[in-house]
C-alpha cells in the first residue's frame, strides 16, 4: 500500500507530532475539539525525508497526494484553487516536531496572480484589501522561496509612502498597492531573471520545497546540534485556507496564550493589530494592542476567544 504523505486536519490528532510536526498535530487536535480552525492539511515529516532521498525533489506520488488534498480543501471551503469565480487562497507554514528558529517563515495569500487579484477585488468590493494581499504575497514568496531579500521590497514601500506623503503602510490606497505589486514583480524579474510565477500549483510546490529546504539551512543545523535534535526528523508543512486580518478596521491578527508564559497563571494574554496580517504583529511595523482592548473593540470575537481558550 502506498505511503500516506498528506493528512487533513480532521484526520490527525495531538499524539501525531512525529508525523505531523508540532503545529500540524495541534491544528488536528483543535479541529477534533470543534474549535473554529480554518481548514487545511499537513504534509508529513516523512515527505520531507523522501524529498531529500529523491535529491531535493518532490516526487510525482507526493505531488499527486498534495493536489488530491487541495481538491478536498476545495470541497470543504467551496472555493477552487486558481479559479476566477471563487478562488481559494492558502497559507504555507513549516512545522517541525520541536519549535526551531531558522525554519522557514510563513507565506500568506498563495494562489494569487494578476487575474485572481482582479476577481477578488471586484467580488469583495474591497480592492485595497485585494492588492494588499497580492503585494504581500509577492514580497513573501520572493523572500522566503527565492531568497530575494526583504530590504529591496521595503525600500520600494518606503519610496511609495514618501511619494504619497504618508508614514504608515495602512495609509496607502488601492492604487498605490496595485502600483507596488507591479514594482515588486519587476524587482523579482530583475533579481531572478524570470517572471513571477502565476500558476498556483507552481507557487504551492515552490513554497513546500522552501519549507523542506529550510530544515537544512545553516541556522537550523546549528540549532539542532546544540539541542540534540536528529537531522533525520525532517519537518512537516501545513497548508491552510486563508483567514484575512487585513480586510479593514473590523478585522485583525494577533497572538494569544491561555496562560501567563512567565508565571503560568490561568489568564488570557496576548496582543493584536487591526487591519493587519500575521507577520505585522512581530515585525514591529506598528505597535500591537494588549488583548484586553479586544473586549472593547470586538466584544463578540473576544468572548469567542475567551470561551475557546477555556
Features from the language model and the residues they span:
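Nucleotide/phosphate-binding sheet-loop regions of phosphoryl- and nucleotidyl-transfer enzymes
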Residues: 1-309
Amino acid at each position: 500500500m502506498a505511503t500516506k504523505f498528506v493528512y487533513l486536519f480532521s484526520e490527525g490528532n495531538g499524539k501525531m507530532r512525529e508525523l505531523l510536526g508540532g503545529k500540524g498535530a495541534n491544528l488536528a487536535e483543535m479541529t477534533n475539539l470543534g474549535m473554529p480552525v480554518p481548514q487545511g492539511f499537513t504534509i508529513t515529516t516523512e515527505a520531507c525525508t523522501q524529498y531529500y532521498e529523491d535529491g531535493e525533489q518532490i516526487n510525482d506520488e507526493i505531488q499527486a497526494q498534495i493536489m488530491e488534498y487541495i481538491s478536498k480543501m476545495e470541497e470543504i471551503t467551496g472555493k477552487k484553487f486558481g479559479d476566477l469565480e471563487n478562488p481559494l487562497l492558502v497559507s504555507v507554514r513549516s512545522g517541525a516536531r520541536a519549535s526551531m528558529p531558522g525554519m522557514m517563515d510563513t507565506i500568506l495569500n498563495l494562489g494569487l496572480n494578476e487575474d485572481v487579484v482582479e476577481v477578488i477585488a471586484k467580488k469583495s468590493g474591497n480592492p485595497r484589501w485585494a492588492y494588499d494581499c497580492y503585494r504581500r504575497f509577492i514580497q513573501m514568496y520572493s523572500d522566503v522561496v527565492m531568497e530575494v531579500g526583504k530590504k529591496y521590497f521595503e525600500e520600494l514601500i518606503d519610496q511609495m509612502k514618501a511619494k504619497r506623503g504618508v508614514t504608515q503602510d495602512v495609509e496607502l490606497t488601492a492604487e498605490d498597492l496595485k502600483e507596488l505589486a507591479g514594482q515588486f514583480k519587476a524587482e523579482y524579474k530583475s533579481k531572478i531573471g524570470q517572471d513571477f510565477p502565476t500558476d498556483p500549483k507552481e507557487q504551492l510546490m515552490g513554497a513546500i520545497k522552501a519549507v523542506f529546504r529550510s530544515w537544512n539551512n545553516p541556522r537550523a543545523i546549528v540549532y539542532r546540534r546544540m539541542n540534540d535534535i536528529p537531522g533525520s526528523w525532517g519537518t512537516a508543512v501545513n497548508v491552510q485556507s486563508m483567514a484575512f486580518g487585513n480586510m479593514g478596521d473590523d478585522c485583525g491578527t494577533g497572538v494569544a496564550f491561555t496562560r501567563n508564559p512567565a508565571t503560568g497563571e490561568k489568564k488570557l494574554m496576548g496582543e493584536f493589530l487591526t487591519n493587519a496580517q500575521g507577520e505585522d504583529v512581530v515585525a514591529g511595523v506598528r505597535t500591537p494592542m494588549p488583548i484586553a482592548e479586544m473586549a472593547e473593540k470586538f466584544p463578540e470575537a473576544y468572548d469567542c476567544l475567551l470561551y475557546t481558550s477555556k
